[in-house]
Amino acid sequence: MICNSQIAEGWHGKLNLVYADRQGATQLIYNQQQAPLKVQRPFYPEAEKVCHSVILHTAGGMVGGDRLSSNIHLQPQAQALITTAAASKIYRSNGLQARQTIQMQVDPGACLEWLPQETILFNDAIYRQDLRVELATGASWLGWEITRFGRSARGEKFLQGEWRSHTEIWQQSVPLWIDRQCLRGSEDIFHSPHGLAGKPIVGSLVWVGGAVSAEIVEKTRSLWNGEGEVGASRLQHGLLCRYRGSSTSEVRNWFIDVWQLLRVSFLNRGNCIPRVWQV
């Protein structure tokens, strides 16, 4: 039963996950969840070293007033790949902000691959996401974010509302990457070359965990063969890729190719596409 206070204030979903290395096998040793967030039983499509997890949002999407809070901790040497079961939907706001906060701690020798499916902002949605990673020396993190502004398949544009996305990666109190984006829905911003340039989809992929050579950057660029606008550049401790275009499959395919390149180059792992993406 949903009480009146839940309806007025929105959901507050919580997820606390802890992964640990147990003699070369990564296990999910702690799982605390509160609806509408839930994590499926872990599985191991590439042997026990890498634990794959899928996060579910059982309510189907977020509305104004909803809060999602996730804390993910990888203990030393743990290896985890986390994705979501479906695209995240942010519905038209009732005047309140929908907000998601994600805190990650990646200990020495651990690696977290954070690969959520796209976020779809309905016109007039108000949404903010804050993601902070505490990365230990010798740890690595790869993550991406794909956002669609408006249900463009239906011809909808993001002309009202607000989107904020703040990503921070820190190591021993030193910022390795800080990315704060904000877009307010309007006709001008949707069509401006300094906004969306008429393109409803943007994406960012970030790898932090090792110096990237010029050769890797060139290979990353050569993997692109789509119609949208893209860029790839070195960070002090990794790689950044950007996309602006009109096709989710286009950006996703490029990000997957880059992810697989980085896996082979830095993690000594082969291709392993999560099954949930193929559903």
UniProtKB/Swiss-Prot annotation:
Annotated S-S bridges: none
Gene Ontology cellular component list: cytoplasm
Principal location: cytoplasm
Subcellular location: Cytoplasm
Annotated coiled-coil segments of the chain: none
Swiss-Prot/TrEMBL keywords: Chaperone, Cytoplasm, Nickel
GO MF annotation, one: nickel cation binding
Cited HAMAP family: UreD
Function: Required for maturation of urease via the functional incorporation of the urease nickel metallocenter.
Binding partners and assembly: UreD, UreF and UreG form a complex that acts as a GTP-hydrolysis-dependent molecular chaperone, activating the urease apoprotein by helping to assemble the nickel containing metallocenter of UreC. The UreE protein probably delivers the nickel.
Entry's family note: Belongs to the UreD family.
Identification of the protein by name: Urease accessory protein UreD
Gene designation: ureD
